[in-house]
């Protein structure tokens, strides 16, 4: 049986990401939110883990040693915190998409963003797991002129 789906090997994804250049990395962000498809998740809440990679040229900041020439990690952290701790959503996909789209919208210097969003405690699974989550990559549309 043949599938019409194409897959990309992890090594190919890593090469594609490395072609994007420099990146800011925020790893292991922890927030408490009320997202989930079942009522208990939306009323009791739970911990969410977030990793964000933001591709942006760091050359000018590296040469100038001036915060004005880069994007503050605190600003990206604050945006993610506001979304995860904000209005409840049914799906992790929606929360990750909001983080990615708002990051690209707010920080015009960022060319692409990768958001990994996970929850280590899943109410529907009565077994030990590290986490369940989503990993999305969004790239700025370079064909449109603003």
UniProtKB/Swiss-Prot annotation:
Lineage of source species: Eukaryota, Viridiplantae, Streptophyta, Embryophyta, Tracheophyta
Family, similarity comment: Belongs to the DHNA family.
Catalytic activity: 7,8-dihydroneopterin = 6-hydroxymethyl-7,8-dihydropterin + glycolaldehyde
Gene: FOLB1
Entry GO MF terms: dihydroneopterin aldolase activity
Tissue: Expressed in roots, leaves, stems and siliques.
Highest taxon, organism lineage: Eukaryota
BP GO annotations: folic acid biosynthetic process; tetrahydrofolate biosynthetic process
Protein name as catalogued: Dihydroneopterin aldolase 1
Keywords: Folate biosynthesis, Lyase
Subunit composition and interactions: Homooctamer. Forms a hollow cylinder assembled from two ring-shaped tetramers.
Entry keyword Thylakoid: no
Residues noted as binding substrate in the record, renumbered to the chain: 41, 73, 92-93
UniProt xrefs under Gene3D superfamilies: 3.30.1130.10
Function statement: Catalyzes the conversion of 7,8-dihydroneopterin into 6-hydroxymethyl-7,8-dihydropterin, a biosynthetic precursor of the vitamin tetrahydrofolate. Can use L-threo-dihydroneopterin and D-erythro-dihydroneopterin as substrates for the formation of 6-hydroxymethyldihydropterin, but it can also catalyze the epimerization of carbon 2' of dihydroneopterin and dihydromonapterin.
Source organism: Arabidopsis thaliana
């Amino acid at each position: 049986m043949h599938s019409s789906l194409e897959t990309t090997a992890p090594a190919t994804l890593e090469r594609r990401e490395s072609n994007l250049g420099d990146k800011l990395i925020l790893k292991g962000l922890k927030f408490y939110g009320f997202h989930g498809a079942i009522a208990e998740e939306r009323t009791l809440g739970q911990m969410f883990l977030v990793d964000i990679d933001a591709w942006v040229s760091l050359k000018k900041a590296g040469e100038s040693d001036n915060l004005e020439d880069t994007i503050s990690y605190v600003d990206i952290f604050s945006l993610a915190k506001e979304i995860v701790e904000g209005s409840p959503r049914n799906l992790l996909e929606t929360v990750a998409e909001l983080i990615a789209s708002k990051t690209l919208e707010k920080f015009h210097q960022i060319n692409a963003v990768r958001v990994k969003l996970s929850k280590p405690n899943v109410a529907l699974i009565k077994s030990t797991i590290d986490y369940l989550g989503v990993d999305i990559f969004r790239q700025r549309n370079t064909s449109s002129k603003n």
